[in-house]
Amino acid sequence: MLKLIMPTIMLIPLTWLSKKNMVWINSTTHSILISLISLSMLFQTTDSNMNFSLMFFADPLSTPLIILTTWLLPLMIIASQSHLIKETTTRKKLYISMLITLQALLIMTFSATELILFYILFEATLIPTLILITRWGNQTERLNAGFYFLFYTLAGSLPLLVILLYMQNTMGSLNMLLIQYFPQTLTHTWTAKLMWLACMMAFMVKMPLYGLHLWLPKAHVEAPIAGSMVLAAILLKLGGYGMMRITMILEPTTTSMSYPFMMLSLWGMVMTTRICLRQTDLKSLIAYSSVSHMALVIMAILIQTPWSYMGATALMIAHGLTSSMLFCLANTNYERTHSRTMILARGLQTLLPLMASWWLLASLTNLALPPTINLIGELLVTMTTFKWSNLTILALGLNMLITALYSLYMLITTQRGKFTYHTYSIKPTFTRESTLMLMHLLPIMLLSINPKIILGPLY
């Protein structure tokens, strides 16, 4: 585990000691090296998991998420160059240091064995993200977005801390590797139901569940490009990962308690896709599409069958790469037209033909076209949900239909039509941007050849 955490921490002195013209090059190349080192974790010789120490372990559920985290740092650094072009060198270095700190915390969160340690790291990831949003955001509303983000997350996860401390007292240990062998502590009393709610609420706010999702569009819209990427790709996955980990203590309450949340997810899935059709703001549209994808993941985790877990992990990885790519594309538009309104950035296909092909590929991946892993995840989740109840096919079918509609609506609005006059003299597509898009698409395409490496511990 140290082979990932130590180089990541050492990236901070590397960034601060780099010369003015080498900051971006050094941080990008070294973070790519770290992400290549992390690939070795995929080849696990044991069937169960790799125990690095008492503190850290990796199993087939956390490994793909750790690799996604390390893969995203170079992409965030590449994407942020244009955004920070007017900043002083010190501020650039500070910005990169924030991203590196966030990555180190996330790697440790995904590999923590102890639930209290997991909770501390889970909350610690809030701080760098908050600084990114409130310091480097674009509009003045970023402070409002930061408040929403902070209070939603904190209010949601405080009950979890109380319950974890209580469980530490009753069970004697909160080690994830031990907990699964303990006798079940929860009974069918109302206190057990409250405990279940307290444990799940923290992760449902983070996912976010429809109804608790108001912080997400705000935070996404106001965050700088790297903030949006890390929020969509990894911080939402923390919720899913935490839910999968904590449900093993909460047996057998989940089966009886999950119905209202599953109904809310199904309803929210259709509602957020319908909200997407009404959006004028590009970033807001992608943020709401994240909510609808994550609703599928919540459904899958609450059903608790091997297939649904496989679908949830596949969908989390797929969504991480896809939504991150869409945010990068939205950012390239924003850098050229200085507006997130879709109507003001229309007809760009004639001006930026290469970017239009990236837009097409990203939109098709987002609507889960075969052979992408998005399709594999959605199919697995849809099948298990249908097996759980046949009626859900109405909501799921409608969700898939509207997802296709808003993805194509986003593509057509930005790429087709007559372009506006203020876009005559825009900059061409840079190699940096094409590389960025390729580095998002490549894992999606390669994983569709061999998807079993991201299907989680039950494959």
UniProtKB/Swiss-Prot annotation:
Superkingdom of the source species? Eukaryota
Q: Which residues cross the membrane?
A: 23-43, 60-80, 92-112, 113-133, 145-165, 196-216, 224-244, 257-277, 284-303, 308-330, 351-371, 392-412, 436-456
* The keyword Translocase appears for this protein: yes
Would you tell me the protein name for this molecule?
NADH-ubiquinone oxidoreductase chain 4
Primary localisation category: mitochondrion
Q: Name one GO molecular function term.
A: ubiquinone binding
| Subunit field text | Core subunit of respiratory chain NADH dehydrogenase (Complex I) which is composed of 45 different subunits.
Q: What are the BP-aspect GO terms? A: electron transport coupled proton transport; mitochondrial electron transport, NADH to ubiquinone; mitochondrial respiratory chain complex I assembly
Identify which top EC class this enzyme belongs to. Answer: translocase
Q: Which UniProt keywords apply?
A: Electron transport, Membrane, Mitochondrion, Mitochondrion inner membrane, NAD, Respiratory chain, Translocase, Transmembrane, Transmembrane helix, Transport, Ubiquinone
> Which Enzyme Commission number(s) are on file for it?
7.1.1.2
Signal peptide positions on this chain: none
Record's InterPro entries? NADH4_N, NADH_Q_OxRdtase_chainM/4, NADH_UbQ_OxRdtase, ND/Mrp_TM
Q: Which Pfam families match?
A: Oxidored_q5_N, Proton_antipo_M
Entries under NCBIfam families matching the protein: NDH_I_M (TIGR01972)
Its UniProt entry gives the catalysed reaction(s) as: a ubiquinone + NADH + 5 H(+)(in) = a ubiquinol + NAD(+) + 4 H(+)(out)
Please name the PANTHER family in this protein's record: NADH-UBIQUINONE OXIDOREDUCTASE CHAIN 4
The UniProt entry lists membrane topology as: Multi-pass membrane protein
> Where does this protein reside within or beyond the cell?
Mitochondrion inner membrane
Q: Which family does it belong to?
A: Belongs to the complex I subunit 4 family.
| Record's function text | Core subunit of the mitochondrial membrane respiratory chain NADH dehydrogenase (Complex I) which catalyzes electron transfer from NADH through the respiratory chain, using ubiquinone as an electron acceptor. Essential for the catalytic activity and assembly of complex I.
GO CC annotations on file? mitochondrial inner membrane; respiratory chain complex I
